[in-house]
């Protein structure tokens, strides 16, 4: 497969720069892989796609305000630090700007000096491992000093940082939001639960690799970034019961999909409690193990996320759906509209 097989022309004005005032009033394009029919709806209509006994799986990760601005202790020069991965023992993998100034032993001071970072390792790809020094609770300090790391295609300042969090976000650790979940409101989730749908949570901490473009022509040569995931025993038991009863497992977003399919691949289609790192790459030809249907946003041309949707619903149908969305002026990417992909069987 060639990367250009997943390309399409997207007018820049369709890239949503701000979230809608009401989360669930975004538009929803229904894709039916069995009939290859499309329906234009609104996100609150997703309840019509769910039946009593189904499970709706949400990713409860919370985005860290992971962009820090500080000064070099030695010279006072400005340094920007982006936190990528918690390595434990107050050490983080980071990206630094300007990186060339950040040699081993370099110290950076943030805010009023409550937080300091010392470079302990320079990585091959240009990242830096830093060790933080602070008094108090690290996450509280980060909340007061850090900024939300918005995707590179969003150029407007976010007025309310909580709009880049889902309403069910609770497990700190992501560098980006699981954007398929941004459309849900507490009221909509309550209606879904009242219908008899089980709402099940898992955790996958989204890394910045989610925005990294595919740099090879041959898709099979692409190496996915790895991300941490966790599914609890209680959640696994709920999902096994749903499967056993013949109902649907509906995933909210590609992060939930990647977690469930990682576990399904690891346990021969069974759903077990598990945690670890996944670099699963779901592309056309993939044999699905767990997920029956899903909602997701509209993704970047030539991205692994478009490939994932194509792996489920078929490349030609998905590209037709994208063209329909472009023609109908749907909003794209993180703050944009959504699609719901019905079961293919």
Swiss-Prot record:
Organism superkingdom: Bacteria
Gene Ontology BP, a term: queuosine biosynthetic process
Pathway noted in the entry: tRNA modification; tRNA-queuosine biosynthesis
A single MF term (Gene Ontology): S-adenosylmethionine:tRNA ribosyltransferase-isomerase activity
Keywords: Cytoplasm, Queuosine biosynthesis, S-adenosyl-L-methionine, Transferase
A matching Pfam family: Queuosine_synth
Catalytic activity: 7-aminomethyl-7-carbaguanosine(34) in tRNA + S-adenosyl-L-methionine = epoxyqueuosine(34) in tRNA + adenine + L-methionine + 2 H(+)
Main enzyme class: transferase
Function in brief: Transfers and isomerizes the ribose moiety from AdoMet to the 7-aminomethyl group of 7-deazaguanine (preQ1-tRNA) to give epoxyqueuosine (oQ-tRNA).
Entry-linked PANTHER family: S-ADENOSYLMETHIONINE:TRNA RIBOSYLTRANSFERASE-ISOMERASE
Assembly with partners or alone: Monomer.
Protein family (similarity comment): Belongs to the QueA family.
Protein's recorded name: S-adenosylmethionine:tRNA ribosyltransferase-isomerase
Organism whose genome encodes this protein: Lactococcus lactis subsp. lactis (strain IL1403) (Streptococcus lactis)
């Amino acid at each position: 497969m060639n990367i250009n097989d997943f390309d399409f022309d997207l007018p820049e004005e369709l890239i949503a720069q701000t979230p809608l005032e009401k989360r669930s009033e975004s538009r929803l394009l229904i894709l039916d892989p069995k009939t290859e029919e499309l329906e234009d709806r609104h996100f609150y209509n997703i309840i019509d796609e769910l039946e009593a006994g189904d499970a709706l799986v949400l990713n409860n990760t919370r985005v860290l305000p992971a962009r820090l601005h500080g000064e070099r202790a030695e010279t006072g020069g400005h340094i920007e630090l982006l936190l990528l991965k918690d390595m434990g023992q107050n050490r983080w993998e980071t990206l630094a700007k300007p990186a060339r100034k950040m040699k081993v032993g370099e110290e950076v001071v943030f805010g009023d000096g409550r937080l300091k970072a010392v470079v302990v390792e320079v990585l091959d790809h240009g990242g830096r491992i830093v060790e933080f020094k602070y008094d108090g609770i690290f996450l509280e300090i980060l909340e007061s000093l850090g900024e939300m790391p918005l995707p590179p295609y969003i150029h407007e300042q976010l007025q309310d940082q909580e709009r880049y969090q889902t309403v069910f976000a609770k497990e700190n650790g992501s560098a980006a939001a699981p954007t398929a979940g941004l459309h849900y409101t507490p009221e909509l989730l309550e209606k879904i639960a009242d219908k008899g749908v089980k709402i099940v949570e898992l955790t996958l901490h989204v890394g910045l690799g989610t925005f990294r473009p595919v740099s090879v022509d041959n898709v099979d040569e692409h190496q996915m970034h790895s991300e941490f995931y966790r599914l609890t025993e209680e959640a696994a038991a709920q999902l096994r019961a749903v499967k056993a009863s013949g109902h649907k497992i509906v995933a909210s977003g590609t992060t939930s999909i990647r977690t469930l399919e990682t576990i399904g691949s690891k346990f021969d289609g069974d759903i077990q409690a598990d945690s670890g790192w996944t670099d699963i790459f779901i592309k056309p030809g993939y044999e699905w193990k767990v997920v029956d249907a899903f909602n997701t946003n509209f993704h970047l041309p030539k991205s692994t996320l478009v490939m994932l949707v194509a792996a489920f619903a078929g490349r030609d149908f998905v590209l037709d759906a994208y063209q329909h969305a472009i023609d109908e002026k749907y909003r794209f990417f993180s703050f944009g509209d959504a699609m719901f992909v019905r079961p293919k069987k």
